[in-house]
C-alpha cells in the first residue's frame, strides 16, 4: 500500500506548507536527508496553546503531537514531491511546553512516533528520538516537533 493510500484510509488529507513565522525555511535537503524545521501544534487552524501539566493533559499533548506529524508530512511531501520516496524517518525531536513537574514528554511524543510507524510501517517509521520538556514554545504552542527523513 502506498503512503498516500494509507493516509487516505486514515481519512487524512495532507495540509499545505505553512508560511514560516520567522527567519527560516520550512525544510532543507542535503544529499538524501531532508531536515524539517520545527512545526507547532495547531487545532482548528489556530495555535494549540498551553502547557502540559497546567491545563493540557498527556492525552491532549499526544493528540497535538499526532496533528504536528500530519503537518510535517505535508511539508515533507512539498520537499520531495512523493512520500513514497521516504526510505525512513531518521530522527524526531519534540519540545513539550510543560511545567517543571511534568515528566511525560516521552508519552506526548508517542503521538508523532506512533503515527509515523502507522503510515510508513514499523521499519521505515522507526526512528531515533529526543523529547524535551521546555518552559515555553513559540507562540505559546503546547508542542513543537522537528523531523529528519531519508529519501531516495
Label the predicted regions.
Residues 1-152:
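Short, polar/acidic, helix-capping and beta-turn segments at strand->helix junctions
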Amino acid at each position: 500500500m502506498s503512503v498516500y493510500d494509507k493516509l487516505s484510509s486514515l481519512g487524512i488529507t495532507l495540509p499545505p506548507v505553512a508560511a514560516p513565522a520567522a527567519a527560516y525555511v520550512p525544510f532543507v535537503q542535503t544529499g538524501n536527508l531532508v531536515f524539517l524545521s520545527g512545526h507547532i501544534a495547531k487545532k482548528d487552524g489556530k495555535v494549540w496553546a498551553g502547557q502540559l501539566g497546567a491545563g493540557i493533559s498527556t492525552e491532549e499533548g499526544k493528540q497535538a503531537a499526532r496533528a504536528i506529524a500530519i503537518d510535517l508530512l505535508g511539508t515533507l511531501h512539498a520537499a520531495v514531491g512523493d512520500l513514497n520516496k521516504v526510505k525512513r524517518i531518521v530522527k524526531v525531536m519534540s519540545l513539550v511546553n510543560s511545567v517543571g513537574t511534568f515528566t511525560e514528554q516521552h508519552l506526548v511524543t508517542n503521538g508523532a512516533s506512533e503515527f509515523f510507524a502507522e503510515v510508513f510501517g514499523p521499519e521505515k517509521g522507526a526512528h531515533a528520538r529526543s523529547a524535551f520538556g521546555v518552559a515555553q514554545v513559540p507562540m505559546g504552542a503546547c508542542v513543537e516537533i522537528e523531523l529528519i527523513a531519508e529519501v531516495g
